Amino acid sequence: MAEILRIENLTKEYKIKKDSIFEPTKYFKALDDVSLTVNRNEIFGLVGESGSGKSTLGKAILKLIKPTSGKIYFDGKDIETFDKRELFDYRRKVQMVFQDPYSSLNPQKKIGWSLMEILGIQKIGTKQERIKMAEKILEDVEMRPSVMEQYPNELSGGQRQRISIASALIVEPELVVIDEGVSALDVSVQAQVLNLLNELQEKYNFTCIFISHDLNVIEYLCDRIAVLHNGVLQEVFNAEELFEEGRAEYTKKLFESVKMKLR
């Protein structure tokens, strides 16, 4: 299968605040020499506890932060070498769905305005074409077009998450990074959104990196799974291999913690 994303020896360090100016500078490694590949049209899971580095990796892919060292290749090209035009295209091709959809929506603007603003920034379509595109993507995420006249605070958490997904997909990206996309939702709503994501991924043929601390969600949704712990990649395996012998010790601990919560 053709790869869309390749990460080579990625490290991200942050300075640790000093208690005294006389202390030597110390660094915390949020990512430590991480290497992996993501294949085109797959759903790739990044799982780990809080502080594992999974969200840091997502931000690096989106160019929201700059790595300390290492490379990220998109379609075979180092994203740090992009010129202005290539970066503009990359911003369309790679989209993000945040954990808190409310924070990614303008509370003072109607949903329709927010969706069409995204198209406007990307210089896609005329005003009438943008309206039709907004109506279509809302139907695809199982929302009525009339929601375009509503404000974010008039919607439920599940509805706002659907709008967040619509906002990412309206520009027809090649890669979507979803960071804890269902963790704030009720279990029943989680299931609805996960099923919707599966359907949308098949319809739009986008690659998805799904970031979560929940191994149950990751195992249900993803084709392959990468496990991170303290910034270090523990292993990468196919989802159906989760319960096989030979998993890394940290993966086993994650799995045991999930079983304890279910008891």
Predicted segments with their positions:
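Conserved ABC ATPase "signature" region
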Residues: 78, 129-146, 255-256
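Conserved ABC transporter NBD signature motif
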Residues: 70-78
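ABC ATPase NBD coupling module
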Residues: 21-25, 79-95, 121, 241-246
